[in-house]
């Protein structure tokens, strides 16, 4: 007599019962195995996994998980965007770029920030997996405050404050240290710039370039590049370079035609995005050259285009802002993003290939500034 094969127990389970069985099985694993499993999962699934249990939520925000991801080579680059929305009750807004559910498109998702963060005229930098918000106005007074957001967990803490209270300072990063210049009422040149060691969380003043130069640099922009700190005056557009603790005039060609805040470094080459172009700096010939292959990158071509760019895991991520008007009335503000792969074909020729681009943010607000973009490896 022929017998009917028994169906497996798993097949007889409802979907809910099967999921509970799988979850129970994973929960029985020791910590190191759970960490090893989670470290292999793309971060886009972490919000869903955090709903499994308190234990999972604890793992997903732990430093051990990210150390394991690093050891396994499972790290990913994530983009963060800082906007200033003038008419908003919280003008300093931080976003992360996330993939839409069940889609390949991406969108800027807001990150909650505490009320204690300086919202008016701070500067913002990224070091490792931490975003630092430095100085700014609190109750109409210049602030010493430094707030730090961990990009892995989106949690905030307060760090050691600056030596001098600063409003609208210029900050840049070099070798894991944060150099902060300008933004202080006191014109004492010895206090004009200070540096923050992110490992020891301590501040100290940097040697002064002299009172005359400091007066020129009360409003400035800066960048860390090739072992030096470069500072550009927003009044005279003079460029100065801090090299091995000494100040000297920088190469004017490095900042000519653009601003340091729109530049980034990839493989020790400076790139900048401004108006309708993406360019790279030939440090030997002291010339800016167009990145070939990107003639039609920007959709908007009839007006100045505010842009920012960042090193995105060896690729170039470019953000640009478009304001849409109808009959001279503002309709909406859009932010676009493109990711560009870079290839050096000749010594004096670098090509870019647009990997993807998309509209990532839309708002009805007109007074929107694209202030910073960052890429964190997590």
UniProtKB/Swiss-Prot annotation:
Domain F-box, residue spans: 23-69
Start and stop residues of the Kelch repeats: 130-176, 178-227, 262-308
PROSITE patterns: FBOX
InterPro entries assigned: F-box-like_dom_sf, F-box/kelch-repeat_ARATH, F-box_dom, Kelch-typ_b-propeller, Kelch_1
Keywords: Kelch repeat, Repeat
Top-level lineage group: Eukaryota
Keyword Repeat: yes
Pfam families: F-box, Kelch_FKB95
Name this polypeptide is given: Putative F-box/kelch-repeat protein At3g43710
């Amino acid at each position: 007599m022929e017998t009917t094969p028994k169906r497996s127990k798993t097949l007889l389970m409802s979907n809910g019962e099967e999921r509970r069985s799988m979850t129970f099985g994973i929960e029985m694993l020791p910590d190191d195995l759970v960490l090893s499993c989670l470290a292999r999962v793309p971060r886009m699934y972490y919000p869903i996994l955090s709903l499994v249990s308190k234990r999972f939520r604890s793992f997903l925000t732990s430093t051990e998980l990210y150390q394991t991801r690093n050891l396994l080579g499972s790290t990913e680059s994530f983009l963060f965007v800082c906007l200033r929305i003038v008419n908003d009750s919280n003008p300093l807004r931080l976003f992360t770029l996330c993939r839409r559910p069940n889609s390949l498109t991406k969108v800027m998702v807001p990150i909650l920030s505490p009320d204690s963060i300086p919202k008016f005229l701070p500067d913002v930098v990224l070091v490792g997996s931490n975003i630092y918000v430095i100085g700014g106005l609190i109750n109409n007074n210049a602030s010493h405050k430094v707030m730090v957001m961990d990009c892995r967990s989106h949690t905030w803490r307060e760090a050691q404050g600056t030596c001098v209270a600063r409003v609208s300072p210029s900050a840049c990063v070099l070798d894991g240290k944060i150099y902060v210049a300008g933004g202080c009422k006191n014109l004492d040149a010895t206090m004009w710039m200070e540096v923050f060691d992110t490992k020891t969380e301590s501040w100290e003043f940097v040697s002064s370039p002299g009172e005359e130069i400091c007066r020129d640099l009360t409003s400035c922009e800066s960048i860390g590049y090739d072992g030096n700190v470069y500072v550009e005056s927003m009044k005279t557009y003079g460029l100065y370079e801090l090299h091995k603790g000494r100040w000297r005039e920088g190469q004017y060609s490095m900042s000519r035609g653009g601003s340091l805040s729109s530049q980034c470094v990839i493989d020790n080459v400076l790139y900048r995005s401004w108006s309708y172009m993406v360019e790279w700096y030939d440090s030997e010939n002291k010339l800016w050259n167009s990145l070939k292959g990107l003639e039609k990158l920007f959709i908007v071509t009839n007006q100045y285009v505010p842009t920012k760019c960042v090193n995105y895991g060896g690729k170039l991520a470019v953000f640009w802002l478009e304001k849409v008007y109808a009959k001279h009335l503002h309709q909406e503000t859009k932010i676009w993003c493109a990711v560009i792969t870079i290839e050096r074909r000749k010594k004096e020729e670098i090509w870019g290939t647009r990997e993807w681009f998309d509209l990532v943010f839309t708002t009805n607000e007109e007074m929107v500034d694209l202030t910073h973009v960052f890429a964190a490896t997590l």
